[in-house]
Amino acid sequence: MVIKLIVGLRNPGSAYEQTRHNAGAWLVTALAQRHNSHFKIDKKMQAELTEIDINNHPCRLVLPLTFMNHSGQTTRIISQFYKIEPGEILIVHDELDLPVGRIKLKTGGGHGGHNGLRDITAQLGTGEFHRLRIGIGHPGHKDLVHQYVLSRPSMHDRQQIYDAIDRGIAIIPIVLSGDMARAMNQVNA
């Protein structure tokens, strides 16, 4: 199945823009910029939206206007409106369980405690969508997670995340073509 929708998870607003939790939105924003595509607010869709076309594979890019815990609402509204199946969706998000700067592509699975993924799974009625996971590292103890994801990374960690974003963007043409196995082999190596 080809990917028709890429959603970069985030918390909206300038207070959250540079936080670790917004790493998914960083990638989707950089992808749009590299293709000279500009986001426009669509209040009905509860998102900033734009479109790109790579090698004759058109794709909608989404930055939800809802907070992370309600990302599923935006994803459901857009996927229903454009008749996009869960298997045609790529969710790009921060991942505590990957070291800073690692990136992994996977299909399906649980939410792993990520509230954005939890809501998307609930709203779509399935977890069978694709995920591009950007490693932000773990603070070491579960009680520190909330504060950690809502804080800004150090300059060193930020650069590692940006490097991971570059590697993620490099596989997007393969992802859009629907060759997930090849994309996984390239990025997960």
Curated annotation (Swiss-Prot):
Localization recorded for this chain is: Cytoplasm
Q: Main role? A: Hydrolyzes ribosome-free peptidyl-tRNAs (with 1 or more amino acids incorporated), which drop off the ribosome during protein synthesis, or as a result of ribosome stalling. Catalyzes the release of premature peptidyl moieties from peptidyl-tRNA molecules trapped in stalled 50S ribosomal subunits, and thus maintains levels of free tRNAs and 50S ribosomes.
Cross-referenced InterPro entries, in alphabetical order? Pept_tRNA_hydro, Pept_tRNA_hydro_CS, Pept_tRNA_hydro_sf
Note one Pfam family from the annotation.
Pept_tRNA_hydro
Q: What span is annotated as the signal peptide, if there is one?
A: none
Q: Which GO terms describe its molecular function?
A: peptidyl-tRNA hydrolase activity; tRNA binding
Residues given in the record as tRNA binding sites: 16, 67, 69, 115
Member of which family?
Answer: Belongs to the PTH family.
Keywords, A to Z?
Cytoplasm, Hydrolase, RNA-binding, tRNA-binding
Q: Give the EC number(s) listed in the UniProt record.
A: 3.1.1.29
Top-level lineage group:
Bacteria
GO biological process per UniProt: protein quality control for misfolded or incompletely synthesized proteins; rescue of stalled ribosome
Q: Which reaction does it catalyse?
A: an N-acyl-L-alpha-aminoacyl-tRNA + H2O = an N-acyl-L-amino acid + a tRNA + H(+)
Q: Which organism is it from?
A: Legionella pneumophila subsp. pneumophila (strain Philadelphia 1 / ATCC 33152 / DSM 7513)
Return the GO cellular component terms, semicolon-separated: cytoplasm
Per the UniProt record, the site (Discriminates between blocked and unblocked aminoacyl-tRNA) maps to 11
Q: How does it assemble?
A: Monomer.
Q: What is this protein called?
A: Peptidyl-tRNA hydrolase
Q: Which residues form the active site?
A: 21 (proton acceptor)
Site features described as Stabilizes the basic form of H active site to accept a proton, chain residue numbers: 94
What PROSITE patterns does the record point to?
PEPT_TRNA_HYDROL_2 (PS01196)
